[in-house]
Amino acid sequence: MTPRSALIDPFSLDGQVAVVTGGTGRLGSQYARALLSAGAAVALFDVATPGPIVRELLDSDALMSSHLVDTTDRAAVDRAMDEVVTRFGAPTILINNAGLASSPADAGLATARFEHYPATAWDAMMESHLKSALLVSQAFLVTFRAAKRDAGSIINVSSTYGVVSPDQSMYERQRLGGQEWFKPVGYSVAKSGMLNFTRWLAEYCAHERLGVRVNTLVPGGVREDGHSPEFVAEYEKRTPLGRMAREDDYNGAVVFLASQASAYMTGAMLVVDGGWTAR
């Protein structure tokens, strides 16, 4: 049954419970704030401990919790999911946001030329993005079924580089002191994989009559301190809206996909990229 609050305000998440993987990072924590502001209780799953900003939010809001968990380990995911159920009840919203931008274990080689891209970096990308989404989605659905919930939403986070290939000439502006720097192939392939994972899982959940919708959020590039001024200028020149994204540019999209406002939407992708992929 649709909650009364959703009939009055289709964007309301009152009474809902959300899990956000990669939840202590810049975007993950922002997605969590958006869900909190709409009324949901939110559990953060991450291999990293919360930084000062997230810790302050955790200390001030009883509807948020943080769980130190390797989302590529099913047993660890199950334990964390049990903790969420004990504290808030069975989750109804899942944001699969975990994933590496490049493999820190391979340092410079992870952004080197394709011919020298390490297989270990490739494996790390597939594990952190796709295996994580697989395992956490499995645990989410097990819990969802057991609680006999009737309406839920899974949001898989992809990237514009899962839709179009990066223009490597832009990344010449990120190369310092002659260092080679290419946007890694593993990142693009993993983010592309999230799109078809969404379509497959959306059809499966519909076939099983679970009431769980599955969609992909496709965000554009967010400005970071590590971006060179030349890179930012080039990116913004190529973006129809003329700027890189801020973290809060995705608040509305996240709440929309999580809520009954998108009740007739599944297996789709919502692109929020300032027009980057329109060209």
PLM regions and their residue ranges:
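Substrate-binding pocket helix/loop in short-chain dehydrogenase/reductase
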Residues: 105-123, 168, 235
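Catalytic loop of short-chain dehydrogenase/reductase
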Residues: 117-119, 150, 155-207, 221
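Conserved glycine-rich Rossmann-like NAD(P)H-binding loop of the short-chain dehydrogenase/reductase
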Residues: 38-54
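Amphipathic alpha-helical dimer-interface segment in Rossmann-like NAD(P)H-dependent oxidoreductases
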Residues: 99, 127-149, 161-165, 202-207, ...
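Canonical Rossmann dinucleotide-binding motif of NAD(H)/NADP(H)-dependent dehydrogenases/reductases
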Residues: 10-43, 201
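Catalytic Tyr-X3-Lys loop
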Residues: 92, 100, 114-134, 155, ...
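Short C-terminal tail/terminal secondary-structure segment
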Residues: 2-9, 101, 111, 237, ...
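Short, small/polar-rich loop/turn modules that mediate ligand/substrate recognition or access, typified
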Residues: 94, 151, 206-213, 265-267
